[in-house]
């Protein structure tokens, strides 16, 4: 830019006519490790993220086994760190193994686990979700919810989303 002072020995890149953006964050990513590496794995996901300008990704837990434990989450994060192309946060399932009801594992998650989600499976039990929100508030967890009613979405997706939005607003 005008009046730019460049320290001796530093390079200057001419970015005239270009758009320069900071690194991006993908809050909803699927690397499919463990269990579905034939779809995507940590190495290919990391390479794709870095090539697209993403330096941080938030990984969904719809893996096999489902990422319901800190051990699985930490293993995925450690492998991403070893590869070293971008930072990765592995989310943990809201309900154990996506069973729609068991949430006791949330009570013992370590502090470095910050996000919980059922990914594409909304929790259909309002009482379970009320308890989840209470635990999340107490433990400092962020709930990423696919808020849709699966019984309605096959025939009216917008209505399915609206019902869940109203439900979540009243909790």
Give the ranges of each region predicted by the language model.
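Functional cores that coordinate and move charged inorganic groups
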Residues: 121, 129-164
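Histidine-rich, glycine-flanked metal-binding segment
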Residues: 1-21
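Active-site gating loops and adjacent loop-to-helix segments of metal-dependent hydrolytic enzymes
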Residues: 52-54, 75-87, 149-171
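Active-site-adjacent beta->alpha loops and helix N-cap segments on the catalytic face
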Residues: 66-76, 122-135
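Distinct, well-ordered alpha-helical segments
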Residues: 69-73, 98-107, 153-159
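Active-site mouth loops of central-metabolism enzymes
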Residues: 27-40, 63, 89-101, 167-171
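Divalent metal-dependent hydrolysis catalytic cores, especially in the metallo-beta-lactamase
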Residues: 44-67, 83-96, 110-124, 140-144, ...
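Metal-associated gating/positioning segment near the N- to mid-region
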Residues: 15-83
